[in-house]
């Protein structure tokens, strides 16, 4: 076997090995996604928590809960949210618990009626009540700008309405009158007081995507291995 053929064998072997490693990596990612999804289902299907004060639980993510307290007067409009091909906002309102601390409640979607000058009517009369929903991460949207540590591109539309491009519960003290906020957002059920247009889809596992990628990598590895072996045997035949 001459040096050229040896080099080709090495290159084919390395390529097949690399493609196989990528395939196994995608399978590992799929397994991680499945485990994460199983954890989500377990938490989301567990019994409801009842919170009247800021919880000391380490992780409330995806837990269903009943909150007792009252809505604050201020409302946040999370910009550039589209529903049924219509532009609008997600409305987030601090909800004061009985101990004075607060939870940021995602009340759903509202239309801007095709104009950024339109200010929707979303206020709620302050009253003690109970609301149901579940905890989850804040909506992901917007681009972080240099020098903005709280809200990016904030815009006051009225005495109690602020339009924002990105949200971070850890920096909401000046919006919630200095009250501490849970790090998770509370997603309100559609039948509750204060709910707007609520049409949320809970996340799937996402493992199918990684399994499909793994199949692609393994298929490419198999095809490349076949081509390499076929060329090796074909060139070797005349020498025998």
Where are these regions (language model features)?
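Surface-exposed, charge/polar-rich loops and edge strands
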Residues: 1-54, 60-240
């Amino acid at each position: 076997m001459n040096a050229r053929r040896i080099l080709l064998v090495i290159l084919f072997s390395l390529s097949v090995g690399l493609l196989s490693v990528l395939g196994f990596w995608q399978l590992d990612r799929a397994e991680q996604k499945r485990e994460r999804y199983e954890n989500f289902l377990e938490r989301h299907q567990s019994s409801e928590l009842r919170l009247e004060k800021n919880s000391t639980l380490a992780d409330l993510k995806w837990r269903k809960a009943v909150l007792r307290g009252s809505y604050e007067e201020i409302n946040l409009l999370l910009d550039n949210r589209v529903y049924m091909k219509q532009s609008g906002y997600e409305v987030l309102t601090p909800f004061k618990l009985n101990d004075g601390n607060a939870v940021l409640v995602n009340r759903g979607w509202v239309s801007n009626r095709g104009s950024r000058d339109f200010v929707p009517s979303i206020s709620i009369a302050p009253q003690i009540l109970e609301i149901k929903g579940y905890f989850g991460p804040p909506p992901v949207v917007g681009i972080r700008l240099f020098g903005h540590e709280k809200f990016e591109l904030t815009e006051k539309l009225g005495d109690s309405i602020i339009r924002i491009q990105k949200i971070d519960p850890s920096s909401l003290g000046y919006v919630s009158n200095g009250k501490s906020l849970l790090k998770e957002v509370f997603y309100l059920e559609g039948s509750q007081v204060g709910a707007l247009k609520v049409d949320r889809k809970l996340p799937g596992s996402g493992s199918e995507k990684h399994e499909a990628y793994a199949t692609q990598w393994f298929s490419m590895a198999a095809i490349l291995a076949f081509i390499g072996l076929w060329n090796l045997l074909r060139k070797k035949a005349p020498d025998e």
